[in-house]
Swiss-Prot record:
Homodimer. Residues 18-147 form the RNase III domain. The lineage of its organism: Bacteria, Bacillati, Bacillota, Bacilli, Bacillales. The gene is rnc. It comes from the Bacteria. GO terms for cellular component: cytoplasm. Its cofactor is Mg(2+). Keywords: Cytoplasm, Endonuclease, Hydrolase, Magnesium, Metal-binding, mRNA processing, Nuclease, RNA-binding, rRNA processing, rRNA-binding, tRNA processing. SUPFAM superfamilies: dsRNA-binding domain-like (SSF54768), RNase III domain-like (SSF69065). The keyword Nuclease applies. It is found in: Cytoplasm. This is Ribonuclease 3. One of its GO terms (molecular function) is rRNA binding.
Length: 246
């Protein structure tokens, strides 16, 4: 009887955690079993064969495809002047394992994962590959339960703002994008200049400007001249995009 009571407490505690997650993200699953499945590792299923559990591997497969599509759509619309090669490179950086782990950790997904005892003892709860898989499985479950619009809304709260904030700017060659745009339009010559160097030698900060035919398009700041020029080019692209919309 006490074992049953213990199991009941564990179940209720687990259910409360999943309800807390739903409240946190502002989404209520119609089928909560799908949500729990997204966090169920194969090691847990192997140790609980008497009760029917399904692991998250199929949901992970689906979520991977949904992420590829949604991120591709977002980048296609967000960066109209970016080449196919650059879009592919940026998407790869966004959906790679280290990035997905960061998104999973931001939502404390590791605390919700159902693991077998062996996997738990070997640190599975914080294993990067496992957390990335759980994030993909969650996206798969969300898609099945709520549809694409809700997936896009969720990513609009968690993933897309990071893109807008420049979290992946290290793989984005803004100077090349700007050069291609100017060449395509035949609008003139780009010139970069370092306006200012600030700070001590070990912690320099550079301010760069990019101009088109002598007219300033953007100013950027960076820890190196190259980084400052990239940020200036990024600002220039945003200026030109805003002008296109008017």
């Amino acid at each position: 009887m006490s074992k049953q009571r213990d199991k009941g407490r564990i179940y209720e505690k687990r259910r409360a955690k999943f309800q807390e997650l739903q409240k946190k993200i502002g989404i209520t699953f119609q089928n909560e079993k799908l949500l729990i499945q997204a966090f169920t590792h194969s090691s847990y299923v192997n140790e609980h064969r008497r009760r029917f559990h399904e692991d998250n591997e199929r949901l992970e497969f689906l979520g991977d495809a949904v992420l590829e599509l949604t991120v591709s759509q977002y980048l296609f619309q967000k960066f109209p002047h970016m080449s196919e090669g650059q879009l592919t490179k940026l998407r790869a950086a966004i959906v790679c394992e280290p990035s997905l782990v960061k998104f999973a950790n931001a939502l404390s997904f590791g605390e919700l994962v159902l693991l077998g005892k062996g996997e738990e003892l070997t640190g599975g709860r914080t294993r990067p590959a496992l957390l990335a898989d759980v994030f993909e499985a969650f996206i798969g479950a969300l898609y099945l339960d709520q549809g694409m619009d809700v997936v896009l809304r969720f990513l609009g709260q968690t993933m897309f703002p990071k893109i807008d904030e420049g979290a992946f700017s290290h793989v984005m060659d803004f100077k090349s994008q700007l050069q291609e745009l100017v060449q395509r339009d035949g609008s003139g010559t780009l010139e970069y200049a370092i306006l200012e160097e600030k700070g001590p030698a070990h912690n320099k900060e550079f301010v760069a400007r990019v101009a088109l035919n002598g007219q300033e398009l953007g100013v950027g700041v960076g820890r190196s001249k190259k980084e400052a020029e990239q940020h200036a080019a990024q600002m220039a692209l945003e200026t030109l995009r805003a002008a296109d919309k008017q």
